């Protein structure tokens, strides 16, 4: 998830100690910070992201149902060049309260109803 988050935020990657001294570190860049060794896990981007939302409005603002939707779908929507969402309910503009928007429309390219 952190690699996807980095891709969506335009970051180069994330430093982690996870995998040090294991087969995971093979071929990965090691970086030293304050005398501590870290592996660089580079950012992940996608050409296309497909996701599902509970509600969407005409400009692509989304809400989700359940903790899984809130945890993963917003990350996926931000890291893709083309982000497509399928929604259960297509709302009129203004029907989704700004406080409940979990993915802003600027990250959504296409809505399937």
Locations of regions flagged by a protein language model:
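Conserved alpha/beta enzyme-core scaffold
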Residues: 1-113
């Amino acid at each position: 998830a952190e690699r996807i988050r980095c891709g969506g935020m335009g970051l180069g990657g994330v430093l982690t100690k996870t995998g040090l001294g294991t087969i995971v570190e093979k071929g990965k860049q090691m970086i030293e910070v304050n005398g501590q060794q870290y592996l660089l896990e580079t950012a992940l981007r996608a050409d296309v992201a497909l996701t599902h939302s509970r509600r969407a409005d005409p400009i692509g603002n989304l809400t989700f149902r359940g903790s899984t939707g809130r945890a993963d779908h917003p990350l996926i929507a931000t890291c893709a060049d083309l982000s497509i969402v399928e929604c259960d309910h297509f709302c009129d503009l203004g029907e989704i309260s700004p406080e409940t928007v979990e993915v802003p429309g600027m990250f959504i390219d296409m809505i399937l109803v």
